[in-house]
Amino acid sequence: MRPEAAGVREARGRLCHCPGDDPGRLPLPRGPESSIPAPWRPWMSPPPGDAELTRTERPCESWGDQHTSGSKGAFGFQHPVRLYLPVSKRQEYLQSSGEKVLASFPVQATIHFYNDDSESGSEEEQEEEAQPNHLQCLEAEVRDSAQEERAE
């Protein structure tokens, strides 16, 4: 090893060392009595003494899927969290209210639409059956243009 490299190594040792590297220093306390707070993990329940994050009331059934098994996460919600909105309000959601709902919700969630009126669903199906689909329109255009070419 070159002497210049040894000098760099010594300089690094003096400039950069961890507090735990000093043999004369006591080790940092670890465990529950430590003064350093544990990092917050949203998928885990808050510590029992943390009153800010503890939620005593149950979330509304329509705001989350309460039928899956597992432990409760942040704010007392069970993950995955699903917000249910009626299909009739889908357009309103797409315009503005969905963004507001998700922004005001305290945890990450997905929005699922449900059929709120069985009659409206059957009406939509009847309308779809009455309207020709895109492929049928293209086929009709091709046939029409072929007939026009033959006529000329």
From Swiss-Prot:
A motif (WRPW motif) lies at residues 40-43. Residues 79-114 are annotated as: Ripply homology domain. Residues 1-76, 113-152 are annotated as: Disordered. This is Protein ripply3. Keywords: Developmental protein, Nucleus, Repressor, Transcription, Transcription regulation. It is found in: Nucleus. It comes from Mus musculus (Mouse). Residues 1-24, 140-152 have a biased composition (Basic and acidic residues). Coiled coil: none annotated. Interacts with TBX1. The Ripply homology domain and the WRPW motif are both necessary for its transcriptional corepressor activity on the transcription activator TBX1. The WRPW motif is required for binding to tle/groucho proteins. The keyword Repressor applies. Disruption phenotype: Mice are viable, fertile and morphologically normal. Show abnormal development of pharyngeal derivatives, including ectopic formation of the thymus and the parathyroid gland, as well as cardiovascular malformation. Belongs to the ripply family. Acts as a transcriptional corepressor. Negative regulator of the transcriptional activity of TBX1. Plays a role in the development of the pharyngeal apparatus and derivatives. Disulfide bonds: none annotated. Its main location: nucleus. InterPro entries: Ripply_fam. It comes from the Eukaryota. One of its GO terms (cellular component) is nucleus. Residues 116-130 have a biased composition (Acidic residues). The lineage of its organism: Eukaryota, Metazoa, Chordata, Craniata, Vertebrata. GO terms for biological process: cell population proliferation; heart development; negative regulation of cell population proliferation; negative regulation of transcription by RNA polymerase II; pharyngeal system development.
